[in-house]
Amino acid sequence: MKVVIVGAGMGGMSAAIALRQIGIDTVVYERVTENKPVGAAISVWSNGVKCLNYLGLQEETAELGGKVETMSYVDGHTGDTMCRFSMHPLIEQVGQRPYPIARAELQLMLMKAYGIDDINFGMKMVGVENDTAGSAAKATFADGTTVSADVIIGADGAGSITREYVLGGPVSRRYAGYVNYNGLVSTDDAIGPATEWTTYVGDGKRVSVMPVSDDRFYFFFDVVEPQGSPYEEGRVREVLRAHFAGWTPGVQTLIDTLDPLATNRVEILDLDPFHTWVKGRVAVLGDAAHNTTPDIGQGGCSAMEDAIALQWAFKDHPDDVHAALAAYQSARTERAADLVLRARKRCDVTHAKDPQVTSRWYDELRNEDGTNIIRGIVGNIVGGPLTPVTAATEG
């Protein structure tokens, strides 16, 4: 059996490794010519880490991951700690430490595990279809190349061409209402403790820092802005100083420290969940299937879960492509949709879609001992192929 995977992002590479583990011939095509992911880092929660471990990357993942011992919320205006709590109850409940990881390093780890020389870079897919006999699927690339395979997996991102084919037309993404500015800086106690995930909140905005490897923080600023607001590259400090004027010194230090030319600006969008992921021998995976906001940190993790579910589906149905893809779709659509909607709900609370609701959340944070926050995070983590719901995780 030959499976073509279009897209060498986290989902595509995880799927390629997972299918190769069970002896399936995989070929990966990627439109870019070098490893330049959008976003500086990613929070890989325990369900995602378990997927990476399953793919044989336990040591590499732990080496790249930041060690988060505690989590805190801080009043952005006063600098007062609203709550601080240990992450160890979460680790004990789900059986795995989460790891924030620099995105380019995670991507490179996956590519190396699969074999960088086995990835076909610079190949932009412009069309995908099943053949008229239903015996193969075909992808067409911008250079005129066509490839046929028993299965084509479209891991071609949020603007997926594969999704258009599977659904029979384009689907509009929804602007979530905010812009995320993100990057990497050296750890600095003036910004936050080196082993803590620190989040400053206020006025429907947030600033967050978390440790990644090599004594660095991954940081992001969330700002409510109209979609398409003008922005001049390299002027991020001026923009953030205006948005966060009067905020606590830790935030000002972060703004002063960041590299304006290495800071990403991302308008955040998502997709309404849909439950048709397969058309004949063509299927979607990752952001192509469930583009989500980053508000619960599950987008990449969900893509990795897709990869494991895809492997299991082909394990169960090694000689029946259609049964395997149907099993994959059945295993994933409800779970992925739930994560999209959980993220959307958290997004609205965090970014003051209803200011009264957000104000109540700030009050709750001031009375939080970590129990409720950890319960919510565990609720996001469980439900995937390697993190089934158990009596322990339900508690």
Curated annotation (Swiss-Prot):
Record-marked site positions (Involved in substrate activation for the transfer of oxygen from the flavin hydroperoxide): R206
* Enzyme class name: oxidoreductase
* EC number(s) stated in the UniProt entry for this protein: 1.14.13.113
Cofactor(s) recorded for this entry are: FAD
Reactions catalysed: urate + NADH + O2 + H(+) = 5-hydroxyisourate + NAD(+) + H2O
Q: What's the superkingdom here?
A: Bacteria
The record's annotation in SUPFAM superfamilies points to: FAD/NAD(P)-binding domain (SSF51905)
> What pathway, per the record?
Purine metabolism; urate degradation
InterPro entries in UniProt: FAD-bd, FAD-dep_Monooxygenase_BioMet, FAD/NAD-bd_sf, HpxO
Q: According to its UniProt record, what is one Pfam family this protein matches?
A: FAD_binding_3
> Which GO annotations describe the biological process of this protein?
purine nucleobase metabolic process; urate catabolic process
Report residues binding substrate.
N180, R206, Y218, F219, F220
Gene Ontology molecular function = FAD binding; FAD-dependent urate hydroxylase activity; NADH binding; NADPH binding; oxidoreductase activity, acting on paired donors, with incorporation or reduction of molecular oxygen, NAD(P)H as one donor, and incorporation of one atom of oxygen; urate oxidase activity
Q: Which UniProt keywords apply?
A: FAD, Flavoprotein, Monooxygenase, NAD, Oxidoreductase, Purine metabolism
> Where does the chain bind FAD?
G11, E30, R31, S43, M125, D287, G297, Q298, G299, G300, C301
How is this protein organized at the quaternary level? Monomer.
Q: Which family does it belong to?
A: Belongs to the FAD-dependent urate hydroxylase family.
Its biological function? Catalyzes the hydroxylation of urate to 5-hydroxyisourate (HIU). Is likely to be involved in the urate degradation pathway to allantoin. Prefers NADH over NADPH as the electron donor.
Q: What is this protein called?
A: FAD-dependent urate hydroxylase
Q: Say which species the protein is native to.
A: Mycolicibacterium vanbaalenii (strain DSM 7251 / JCM 13017 / BCRC 16820 / KCTC 9966 / NRRL B-24157 / PYR-1)
Q: What is the lineage of its organism?
A: Bacteria, Bacillati, Actinomycetota, Actinomycetes, Mycobacteriales
